[in-house]
């Protein structure tokens, strides 16, 4: 048996971040010949507790994970190698490949494993998850009779969600969280731009009116606070506030405050 590289992943980990050169190696028979290395895209869809995974997942192919990318090393170190993450697994879905089919690779599970060497160090492994295996097992289940169903008391009611539902829920949560973060970033950017334009308009208006230094600071603060209040609704939206609107507001306030 020889350890050969079979796959190279580009992994979308969320928030427009993609880590590269995630190499998956596994053992092949010596007579298997040259192994063609395949490239594919994948995305993280959720985190799971590997101690609570169903037994049928252990039937998948197993890989050792390597990389030459410092960014990829840091990602897996932060997500899997810390003590508080000792039972964590990362579920990834294959999203694009020119050579792989859904039957070959659908999901990957990344987790850490204690190496069986003298150093007793950890390494990252990956396992292929085939939901088709679960579907086949589901078909072979013997249905219970009505009497048997009544006598069965579920020990963990509500916890029988399929792995497909869990993964889909995790994906929706990630999308909602990402959208919320993106909106907050846009709001912060708009507020910074508004503050800068507002300050420029007020200072320019005060200079044009030749306001005395003793009144300068007081008028600036009054105009600034009044303008913020006037645009309070617009500042809750991601649509930028135009320079002309800010300038008109400042001019109106300065005319009122200076009676010019």
Curated annotation (Swiss-Prot):
Keyword S-adenosyl-L-methionine: no
Family, as annotated: Belongs to the SLD7 family.
Primary localization class, coarse: nucleus
Presence of the UniProt keyword ATP-binding in the record: no
Function description: Required for the proper initiation of DNA replication. Required for mitochondrial morphology.
Key words of the record: Cell cycle, Cytoplasm, Cytoskeleton, DNA replication, Nucleus
Pfam families: Sld7_C, Sld7_N
GO cellular component: cytoplasm; nucleus; spindle pole
Subcellular location per the Swiss-Prot or TrEMBL entry: Nucleus; Cytoplasm, Cytoskeleton, Spindle pole
Gene Ontology biological process terms from the UniProt entry: DNA replication; regulation of DNA-templated DNA replication initiation
Stated name of the protein: Mitochondrial morphogenesis protein SLD7
